[in-house]
């Protein structure tokens, strides 16, 4: 694509109050280095777990690291779509987004190495058909589509797939599982720190996805139907992934139940509809500086903290 001008030189400069650049500034302010996390106690805690507990937790970690790797590879077309749309602020934020996904891949791999898990883990995912469909089919297809079709509808479908369902349901449910494993037992402090750091990054990622869907719905109400349709296609698949995981175990460790996690995931998915629908008919200028997408993710985080504290 030939370049004819530089947006950063435009009169008035960049709108630092726009949500994408607010997220970008937030990521800069909260930068963290995986090498600074202390995993030294995690090895002893890991070895104190039963074989069943280690197997369940290894599968959970395998799902996370493979997901982080997938997004690191697949997010590039969204950057190109933002460039095609002339949205420098979004493109700047997505460069940070991609860097953070690569960093998340790094830190999960560092944790696996620290606790001594070096064998091939692909088999843990091969037993999860819904997971494989989501990450090996739905995610790359929806994001790759942006390379040839960067339209608002295609952006909404891609954002729903990753930001709303994969991050907004599946990943949040996985973080909840790690909290239940680690905090309830007072173990794996390195993993606790890892999850806290990643969760903070991904709240910004989800907020950007919500913002992107909101601005497209505000601009054209037809995109609301695109959002609804894609959510209704993928929510059952996300819930089926939880079923697949629990079905592999005659005995589930750590006192976890499928019903608890299904309810948690479904709640996070369904509450996203209201945030997107509230943008219908709104002026685009308002959407650009409306921070409700970030407030929603902060609300979810606060609810989790209170719930986990009450159950401790």
From Swiss-Prot:
According to its UniProt record, which cofactors does this protein need?
Fe cation; Mn(2+)
**SUPFAM superfamilies noted in UniProt:** Ferritin-like
Annotated EC: 1.-.-.-
Binding-site residues, Mn(2+): 68, 101, 104
InterPro entries from the entry? Ferritin-like_SF, R2LOX, RNR-like, RNR_small_fam
Entry's cofactor comment? Binds 1 Fe cation per subunit.
**What this chain does, per the record?**
Probable oxidase that might be involved in lipid metabolism.
**How is the subunit organization of this protein annotated in UniProt?**
Homodimer.
Q: What is this protein called?
A: R2-like ligand binding oxidase
Q: Which organism is it from?
A: Mycolicibacterium vanbaalenii (strain DSM 7251 / JCM 13017 / BCRC 16820 / KCTC 9966 / NRRL B-24157 / PYR-1) (Mycobacterium vanbaalenii)
Q: Lineage from the top down? A: Bacteria, Bacillati, Actinomycetota, Actinomycetes, Mycobacteriales
């Amino acid at each position: 694509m030939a370049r004819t001008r530089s947006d950063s030189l435009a009169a008035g400069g960049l709108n630092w109050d726009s949500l994408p650049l607010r997220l970008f500034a937030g990521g800069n302010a909260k930068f963290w280095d995986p090498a600074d996390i202390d995993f030294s106690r995690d090895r002893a805690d890991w070895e104190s777990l039963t074989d069943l507990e280690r197997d369940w937790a290894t599968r959970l970690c395998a799902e996370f690291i493979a997901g982080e790797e997938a997004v690191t590879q697949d997010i590039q077309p969204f950057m190109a779509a933002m460039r095609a749309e002339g949205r420098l602020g979004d493109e700047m934020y997505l460069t940070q987004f991609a860097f953070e996904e690569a960093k998340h891949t790094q830190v999960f791999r560092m944790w696996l190495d620290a606790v001594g898990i070096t064998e091939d883990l692909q088999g843990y995912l091969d037993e999860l058909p819904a997971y494989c469909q989501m990450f090996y089919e739905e995610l790359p297809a929806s994001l790759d589509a942006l390379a040839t079709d960067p339209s608002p509808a295609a952006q909404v479908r891609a954002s729903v797939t990753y930001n709303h369902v994969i991050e907004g349901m599946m990943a949040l449910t996985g973080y909840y599982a790690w909290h239940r494993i680690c905090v309830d037992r007072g173990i794996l402090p390195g993993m606790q720190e890892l999850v806290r750091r990643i969760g903070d990054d991904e709240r910004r990622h989800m907020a950007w996805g919500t913002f992107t869907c909101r601005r497209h719905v505000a601009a054209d109400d037809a995109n609301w139907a695109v959002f609804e349709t894609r959510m209704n296609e993928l929510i059952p698949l996300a819930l089926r992934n939880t079923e697949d995981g629990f079905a592999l175990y005659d005995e589930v460790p750590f006192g976890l139940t499928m019903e608890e996690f299904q309810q948690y995931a479904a709640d996070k998915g369904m509450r996203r509809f209201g945030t997107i629908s509230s943008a219908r008919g709104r002026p685009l200028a308002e959407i650009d500086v409306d921070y409700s997408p970030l407030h929603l993710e902060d609300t979810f985080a606060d609810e989790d903290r209170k719930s986990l504290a009450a159950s401790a």
